[in-house]
Amino acid sequence: MPNTPAAVRQGITVATAAPEVSAAEKKRCHELLEAVGQVLWVDDEALMDPVTALSGSGPAYVFLLVEAMAAAGAKLGLTPEMAMQLARATVSGSGELLKQSSEPAAQLRVNVTSPGGTTAEALKVLMAADGIQPVFDKALAAASRRSKELAG
């Protein structure tokens, strides 16, 4: 299951192979898939449903995040164009920082959060019991269920 960032060679593809596929065939497949980004392999084909939910559909979640950030910025008085430019650059730059850093995402989040500051205040809302984590839990579970249904 590839994802759409493959269009700019920044994708990630998760693949599985039947036991009868030779090591040479698997290697060739890996080389072809690497042309559009990272490649991971799973032995258990049942994992393809959660993979689809997380990374196959994941770009849409990021794009929705950008839309939501830009809309919130516009509601605070920024022009829609400026709000979108800020949201796009923030998500793109944060993604690149995450990619280049050896620190986990949680530590990068802590690094940008000053105690009692603006980020801390926003994170209180986003990390509340009814915040972003339960929404993602439900969304990915729904996508995984739908992937199973579509697979028959």
Protein language model features and the residues they cover:
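Conserved beta-loop-beta element that borders a ligand/cofactor-binding pocket
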Residues: 1-2, 41
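A short glycine-threonine-serine/GTX helix/turn-capping micro-motif
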Residues: 49-60, 109
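Alpha/beta catalytic cores of group-transfer enzymes, especially the acyltransferase/condensing modules
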Residues: 5-6, 101
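NAD(P)-dependent Rossmann-like dehydrogenase/reductase catalytic/cofactor-binding core
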Residues: 84, 88-152
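Internal alpha-helical scaffold of NAD(P)-dependent oxidoreductase catalytic cores
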Residues: 12-50, 61-101, 146
